[in-house]
């Protein structure tokens, strides 16, 4: 076991108290993780923190995005104040894509891979209206102009036959509306080569050709 110790100067404003114990604030914790933890892990922490602070709602998306942008700017300002710290480039890349609209760690990791591949930025949880069924679907990640989507599937999503039937109807409806998509599982996330091939196969060759890896998100 390798034990590493690091000494950092901690401003009083970055310390709070929980159950009588001194701990770092939510935003400071997000920053420390963005600097020191692999991006596929720190993005989950950053997304979760933004979701807790913003409390986004689908029917007030613009207001939710505004609150998220305000918090993200604060994180970026504090990050630049620590720019000499090791891991700054990685931290910038993580904070830049942090979003309150990710609904699970699996979605966050999937988006980290998408961004690391250099693909166009996806829209999280956009509404796709189905006029026939009179319902709105919300894919996890989507590229509306291309009618491409990615969905993360955890086991809890399919606990009953009703869940399976509802998901089948959803997939059929999106296909009928001209959308193409892939469903990503934890097994895919544990196999980056397979996952990347799965994602890239969805996109037109010209977009794949223009894509450039983002090394800060592969660290």
List each language-model region with its residue ranges.
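Basic, glycine-rich
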Residues: 127-137, 143-219
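Short beta-strand or tight-loop elements
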Residues: 118-120, 124, 137-139
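Residue-level signal for threonine
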Residues: 25, 104, 160
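Phosphate-handling catalytic interfaces
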Residues: 1-100, 108-113, 117-121
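Short acidic-hydrophobic surface loop/beta-edge motif
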Residues: 15-16, 126-128
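Active-site glycine- and acidic-residue-rich loops that bind
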Residues: 100-103, 132
């Amino acid at each position: 076991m390798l034990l590493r110790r690091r000494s950092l100067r901690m401003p009083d404003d970055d310390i709070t108290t929980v159950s009588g114990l001194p701990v770092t604030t939510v935003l400071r914790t997000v920053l420390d993780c963005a600097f020191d933890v692999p991006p596929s892990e720190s993005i989950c922490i950053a997304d979760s923190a933004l979701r807790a602070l913003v409390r986004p709602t689908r029917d007030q998306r613009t207001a939710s995005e505004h609150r998220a942008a305000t918090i993200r700017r604060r994180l970026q300002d504090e990050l630049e104040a620590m720019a000499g710290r090791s891991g700054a480039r990685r931290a910038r890349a993580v904070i830049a894509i942090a979003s309150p609209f990710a609904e699970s760690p699996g979605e966050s990791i999937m988006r980290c891979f998408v961004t690391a591949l250099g693909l166009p930025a996806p829209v999280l949880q956009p509404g796709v209206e189905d006029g026939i069924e009179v319902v709105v679907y919300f894919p996890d990640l989507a590229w509306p102009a291309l009618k491409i989507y990615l969905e993360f599937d955890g086991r809890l999503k399919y606990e009953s036959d009703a869940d399976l039937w509802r998901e089948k109807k959803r997939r059929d409806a999106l296909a009928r509306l001209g959308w193409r998509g892939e469903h990503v599982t934890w097994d895919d996330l544990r196999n980056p080569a397979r996952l990347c091939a799965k994602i890239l196969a969805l996109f037109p060759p010209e977009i794949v050709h223009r894509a450039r890896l983002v090394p800060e998100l592969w660290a």
